[in-house]
Amino acid sequence: MGKSLSQWDDSIFSNFVVRYGFDLSEKVESYSIGMKTLFLLGLCICSQADLLILDEPTQHLDPTVRLEVMSLLKEYVDGERSAIVSSHEIFELEEYATHLAIIKEGRIIYTDSIDEAKEKHRIIEKGESLQEGEVVGLVVQNVLVKTNSDVGRYPKLNEIVVAYLTGKSERRLALK
Protein backbone atom coordinates (compact mmCIF):
# COMPACT_ATOMS: atom_id res chain seq x y z
CA MET A 1 0.00 0.00 0.00
CA GLY A 2 2.67 2.52 1.01
CA LYS A 3 4.56 2.12 -2.24
CA SER A 4 1.79 3.75 -4.27
CA LEU A 5 1.95 7.00 -2.30
CA SER A 6 4.65 9.30 -3.62
CA GLN A 7 5.53 10.84 -0.23
CA TRP A 8 5.02 7.71 1.91
CA ASP A 9 7.63 7.39 4.67
CA ASP A 10 8.44 3.72 5.47
CA SER A 11 10.72 4.64 8.38
CA ILE A 12 7.97 6.59 10.15
CA PHE A 13 5.55 3.71 9.54
CA SER A 14 8.03 1.11 10.87
CA ASN A 15 8.70 3.19 13.99
CA PHE A 16 4.97 3.68 14.50
CA VAL A 17 4.29 -0.06 14.21
CA VAL A 18 7.04 -0.90 16.70
CA ARG A 19 6.20 1.94 19.12
CA TYR A 20 2.55 0.93 19.42
CA GLY A 21 2.97 -2.83 19.02
CA PHE A 22 0.86 -3.40 15.92
CA ASP A 23 0.75 -6.99 14.72
CA LEU A 24 0.73 -6.59 10.95
CA SER A 25 -0.15 -10.26 10.48
CA GLU A 26 -3.58 -9.49 11.97
CA LYS A 27 -6.38 -7.83 10.06
CA VAL A 28 -6.98 -4.25 11.14
CA GLU A 29 -10.65 -5.11 11.73
CA SER A 30 -9.53 -7.37 14.61
CA TYR A 31 -7.86 -4.44 16.44
CA SER A 32 -9.66 -2.71 19.30
CA ILE A 33 -11.42 0.54 18.46
CA GLY A 34 -8.56 2.57 19.99
CA MET A 35 -5.93 0.61 18.06
CA LYS A 36 -7.88 1.08 14.82
CA THR A 37 -7.97 4.83 15.46
CA LEU A 38 -4.25 4.87 16.18
CA PHE A 39 -3.41 2.74 13.14
CA LEU A 40 -5.42 4.94 10.78
CA LEU A 41 -3.82 8.04 12.23
CA GLY A 42 -0.42 6.44 11.69
CA LEU A 43 -1.29 5.84 8.04
CA CYS A 44 -2.25 9.50 7.68
CA ILE A 45 1.00 10.73 9.22
CA CYS A 46 3.12 8.35 7.14
CA SER A 47 1.48 9.63 3.96
CA GLN A 48 3.30 12.93 4.48
CA ALA A 49 0.33 14.69 2.85
CA ASP A 50 0.33 18.49 2.83
CA LEU A 51 -3.13 18.55 4.40
CA LEU A 52 -4.71 16.09 6.84
CA ILE A 53 -8.44 16.24 7.54
CA LEU A 54 -9.10 14.38 10.78
CA ASP A 55 -12.38 13.66 12.55
CA GLU A 56 -11.97 13.00 16.28
CA PRO A 57 -8.37 11.73 15.86
CA THR A 58 -7.89 10.93 19.54
CA GLN A 59 -11.26 9.32 20.20
CA HIS A 60 -10.98 5.99 22.05
CA LEU A 61 -7.29 6.52 22.90
CA ASP A 62 -6.01 6.29 26.45
CA PRO A 63 -4.65 9.53 27.96
CA THR A 64 -0.94 8.79 27.47
CA VAL A 65 -1.36 7.77 23.83
CA ARG A 66 -3.67 10.74 23.28
CA LEU A 67 -0.96 13.11 24.51
CA GLU A 68 1.64 11.45 22.27
CA VAL A 69 -0.67 11.60 19.25
CA MET A 70 -1.39 15.31 19.72
CA SER A 71 2.35 15.92 20.05
CA LEU A 72 2.94 13.98 16.81
CA LEU A 73 0.30 16.03 15.02
CA LYS A 74 1.79 19.27 16.30
CA GLU A 75 5.21 18.18 15.06
CA TYR A 76 3.67 17.14 11.74
CA VAL A 77 2.17 20.58 11.07
CA ASP A 78 5.15 22.60 12.32
CA GLY A 79 6.58 22.54 8.81
CA GLU A 80 4.74 23.33 5.61
CA ARG A 81 1.82 21.00 6.35
CA SER A 82 -1.60 21.63 7.85
CA ALA A 83 -4.28 19.64 9.63
CA ILE A 84 -7.96 20.35 9.97
CA VAL A 85 -9.22 18.60 13.10
CA SER A 86 -12.86 18.14 13.99
CA SER A 87 -13.13 17.41 17.69
CA HIS A 88 -15.29 17.71 20.77
CA GLU A 89 -12.15 17.61 22.94
CA ILE A 90 -11.78 21.37 23.29
CA PHE A 91 -9.33 21.26 26.21
CA GLU A 92 -7.04 19.16 24.04
CA LEU A 93 -7.29 21.43 21.02
CA GLU A 94 -6.48 24.51 23.07
CA GLU A 95 -2.97 23.15 23.57
CA TYR A 96 -2.25 22.33 19.93
CA ALA A 97 -4.49 24.25 17.53
CA THR A 98 -3.77 27.73 16.22
CA HIS A 99 -7.19 28.53 14.72
CA LEU A 100 -10.77 27.51 15.34
CA ALA A 101 -14.09 27.42 13.55
CA ILE A 102 -17.20 26.84 15.63
CA ILE A 103 -19.85 24.97 13.67
CA LYS A 104 -23.50 24.82 14.68
CA GLU A 105 -26.16 23.06 12.62
CA GLY A 106 -23.76 22.77 9.70
CA ARG A 107 -22.83 26.46 9.60
CA ILE A 108 -19.66 28.20 10.73
CA ILE A 109 -20.81 30.70 13.34
CA TYR A 110 -17.40 31.97 14.47
CA THR A 111 -13.84 31.65 13.23
CA ASP A 112 -10.57 33.21 14.36
CA SER A 113 -7.11 32.40 15.62
CA ILE A 114 -7.35 31.01 19.14
CA ASP A 115 -5.16 33.79 20.53
CA GLU A 116 -7.28 36.49 18.85
CA ALA A 117 -10.51 34.85 20.00
CA LYS A 118 -9.31 34.96 23.60
CA GLU A 119 -8.14 38.56 23.20
CA LYS A 120 -11.46 39.76 21.75
CA HIS A 121 -13.68 38.21 24.43
CA ARG A 122 -14.14 38.51 28.19
CA ILE A 123 -16.05 36.58 30.82
CA ILE A 124 -18.14 38.77 33.09
CA GLU A 125 -20.54 37.88 35.88
CA LYS A 126 -24.20 37.48 35.02
CA GLY A 127 -25.92 40.77 35.83
CA GLU A 128 -22.73 42.85 35.49
CA SER A 129 -23.27 45.92 33.33
CA LEU A 130 -21.55 46.14 29.97
CA GLN A 131 -20.68 49.59 28.64
CA GLU A 132 -19.34 48.50 25.26
CA GLY A 133 -19.47 45.23 23.37
CA GLU A 134 -21.79 42.39 22.45
CA VAL A 135 -23.17 39.57 24.57
CA VAL A 136 -22.30 36.25 22.94
CA GLY A 137 -23.91 33.81 25.37
CA LEU A 138 -24.02 32.19 28.78
CA VAL A 139 -21.25 30.06 30.23
CA VAL A 140 -22.76 28.41 33.33
CA GLN A 141 -23.38 31.45 35.62
CA ASN A 142 -21.15 33.82 33.64
CA VAL A 143 -21.49 35.68 30.36
CA LEU A 144 -19.13 35.74 27.39
CA VAL A 145 -18.92 39.17 25.77
CA LYS A 146 -17.11 40.32 22.67
CA THR A 147 -15.50 43.61 23.66
CA ASN A 148 -12.37 45.73 23.56
CA SER A 149 -13.01 46.89 27.13
CA ASP A 150 -10.83 45.72 29.98
CA VAL A 151 -13.62 44.04 31.94
CA GLY A 152 -13.93 40.66 33.59
CA ARG A 153 -11.34 38.06 32.73
CA TYR A 154 -10.02 36.42 29.59
CA PRO A 155 -11.97 33.27 28.64
CA LYS A 156 -10.76 29.74 28.14
CA LEU A 157 -11.32 28.24 24.70
CA ASN A 158 -14.08 25.93 25.93
CA GLU A 159 -15.96 28.94 27.34
CA ILE A 160 -15.85 30.66 23.95
CA VAL A 161 -17.13 27.53 22.21
CA VAL A 162 -19.93 26.92 24.74
CA ALA A 163 -21.11 30.55 24.61
CA TYR A 164 -21.26 30.60 20.82
CA LEU A 165 -23.07 27.25 20.72
CA THR A 166 -25.66 28.34 23.30
CA GLY A 167 -25.58 31.83 21.82
CA LYS A 168 -28.64 33.62 20.54
CA SER A 169 -31.24 31.71 22.51
CA GLU A 170 -29.39 32.50 25.73
CA ARG A 171 -28.44 36.15 25.09
CA ARG A 172 -31.66 37.57 26.47
CA LEU A 173 -31.05 35.74 29.77
CA ALA A 174 -27.40 36.71 30.03
CA LEU A 175 -27.70 40.20 31.47
CA LYS A 176 -30.75 39.61 33.70
Please tell me what each predicted stretch does.
Residues M1-F39:
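ABC-family P-loop ATPase nucleotide-binding domains
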Residues L52-E56:
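Catalytic Walker B motif of ABC-type/P-loop ATPase nucleotide-binding domains
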Residues P63-V65:
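Helix N-cap at the start of a conserved alpha-helix in ABC-type nucleotide-binding domains
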Residues S86-H88:
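H-loop (His-switch) motif in ABC-type P-loop NTPases
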Residues L93-E95:
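A short, surface-exposed alpha-helical micro-motif characterized by mixed small hydrophobic
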Residues V135-K176:
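C-terminal coupling/interaction segments
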